[in-house]
Amino acid sequence: MLRRLTDRKEWKFFAVLPKADPPLAAAWWTVLLLRGVLPAAFAIAMGVLVGAVQGGHSLAAPLAFAGAVFVLLQVLSPIHQAISSNLGDRTAAWLYDRLTEACVRPPGIGHLEDPTLTSDLTVARDFDLGMTGPPLSISMDFIANGMVEMIGGVASAAILVRYAWWAPLLLAGAWLATHWLLRESAIWRDRNTEEVRGAQRDADYAYRLAVDPPASKELRLFGFGGWTVDRFTVRRTRLHELQYAATRLRERPVVWSVLLVVSANVVVFWLLARAAGEGRIGLGEAVVYVQSAVGVSMIAFGGFSWALDGAAAPVAAVLRLEPAMRPAGALRSGSRRADPAPAREIRLRDVTFAYPSTSLGTGDAGAAVLAHFDLTIPAGSSLAIVGQNGAGKTTIAKLLCRLYDPQSGAIEIDGVDVRDFDLASWRSRVAAVFQDFMRLELPLRDNVAPAGAPDEIVRGALVSAGAANLAALDTVLARAYDGGTDLSGGQWQRVALARALAAVALGAGVVLLDEPTAQLDVRGEAEIFDRLLAETRHCTTILISHRFSTVRHADRICVLEHGRVVELGTHDELMALGGRYRTMFDLQAQRFNVPEEEAGTTYDVLS
């Protein structure tokens, strides 16, 4: 029983508050309890005052008592609101700290791409942005007010016991029944069902198409304006229909709630009135009991339920993610220090790897992306990897960077399993540019060398990447900052390339480029790739690209299909072979109807 209670997300939410800020949490609970009992105390104070007036006694003490309680009722509310707001902010910060640590601390990235963790990660990440409910700084006040009313209702019921033991039970039972009767319909009304959320997403999508700048060009060019308006109207109408249907769901529960509450209150107030009329209770007692009977209504169903549910869900999500992310992103780290560069070769030996499967629903591995994969890359050479989407090209890049480890087989550097190297040592020897590279809202210097580097290295990397005149090193790459600037997609790609070249200058001996020039123009691509090969001529370079005008310059080209090497050789060898590489190369060439012998100067535009 106790275990079931402590496993509830509401319990976990309240348990987190003192961890986030112990003094503030203590103050929040103290003021909450005071506010909860003050309505009952005020009822007693008014009864004492009325009794004193009726009996002709001194009014000084009763008035002072009633005045003090009244002042506290007025003063404690704004104080509690301020405490709630601060505690909500501290709790949100505590949760974000825990979430950030849980996401960043594991050395791999499996926990960030595991579909079984996606739902919790989304809830935990977005909870305080106002997307799924009010931020904690606001919802804490709703929760506080709801709990004050609950405590006030219980305190009022306790006073009413003195009149008749059954009276508080009757009233409390009627008001508590509203929680059971209205909860499910309230969840529907608050758009917490999948159907309502789906309709909201559909309507929001059409709305964003209409008002957001990125879609404005195509919207007008292809004449989608009318379609967008019609789509928004239909989806929004559907959403309103669902909301209306949800409101109709409340009709029967509301009727039953009204009948129960009215019946219980009629019985209690009628008997109180008769007792007062017959003189069985005094006027002062009648005032106390009437106010207490009214106070019991504070335990009725209200905003407390949905506010607590919305605040408790992300807490439970973060607490679930912490232990789940650690093993999902775990990687073994050895003790050997990696050499600056491979001396003989990089070998992927009998490597099998699969990502966690959504279909299995357990985080177990799904279909293998690479199966018994073998590939040897001579040290100091350049290898281009090509293939259709899903062939496993980017997966190889992730494995070489040790963002994942294979389920079987090994990646060996000069015969040494890469898992035997110290993880940080190995990664310092790898310079990588991924398709979704970082765009840091930091100065240009820190974008090129996030871990720090002499300005000479930073400037040299920018020159080699064709970004020498991009901006001053201290310029923040975001317009939101004073003196900041924004960059185009191609300019950002040059910064990412400069980051890799700076890593090479700092000692990296393996260069991994995943679509490194996808956002550059034709002339810029040819220029940058020639520079890259020149700057990394002493390194082992792995290039992943769909542009055959780029990959043809590599020492060797590897064609992947369904996680296996189907062709391997130089550009000339693969063209002479007449296999898949030749087919893909000719397919790009035919789009421009250019003779093959001119391909080296014209295919740069293809992607």
Task: Say what each PLM segment does.
Residues 338-340, 388, 397-460, 526-538, ...:
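Conserved post-Walker A segment of ABC ATPase nucleotide-binding domains
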Residues 121, 368, 467-495, 499-516, ...:
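ABC-fold ATPase nucleotide-binding domain signature/coupling loops
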Residues 9, 15-23, 125-139, 192, ...:
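An intracellular "coupling" helix at the cytosolic face of ABC transporter transmembrane type-1 domains
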Residues 1-39, 61, 80, 117-119, ...:
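Membrane-integrated ABC transporters
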Residues 530, 538, 546-607:
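C-terminal portion of ABC ATPase nucleotide-binding domains
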Residues 26-80, 150, 154-186, 263-287:
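Transmembrane helix-loop-helix hairpins at lipid-water interfaces of multipass membrane proteins
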Residues 224, 268, 295-326:
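Cytosolic ends of transmembrane helices, especially the final helix of ABC transmembrane type-1 domains
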Residues 437-481, 501-508, 580-583:
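Conserved "ABC signature" C-loop
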